[in-house]
Amino acid sequence: MLDIEFSGHGGYDAAREAVLLPIQFDGADIRYYVSRDALLRKFGAAADADPGKVFDENRLQIEMIATLYLRQGKGDGTVLTADDF
């Protein structure tokens, strides 16, 4: 069984326009990102909404997709976009 631990979000990365999702996966540090576009389009956030807050409000769904992708072998640096939800 895969050992996956989520630790919340790691803040907003303005250069990537995404919220960092730090993950411990089988002892390795993995970084996924959730795009601002996904937060706006798929989770109904207002354009001026705090990306971290929108992430927190939808954390369960985000973690479910991240878990699926980890099991499929998608590694460090994966960006979750609106199409992933």
Listing of model-derived features with the role each one plays in the protein:
Residues 12, 32-33, 55:
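Aromatic side chains
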Residues 1-23:
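Short, charged/polar N-terminal "headpieces" of proteins
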Residues 10, 16, 36-37, 59, ...:
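Generic alpha-helical secondary structure signal
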Residues 2, 17-19, 28-30, 74-78:
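Generic structural motif recognizing short loop/turn segments at the entrances and edges of beta-strands
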Residues 18-43:
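A short, structured beta-strand/loop element
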Residues 3-6, 46-85:
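Acidic, low-complexity intrinsically disordered segments
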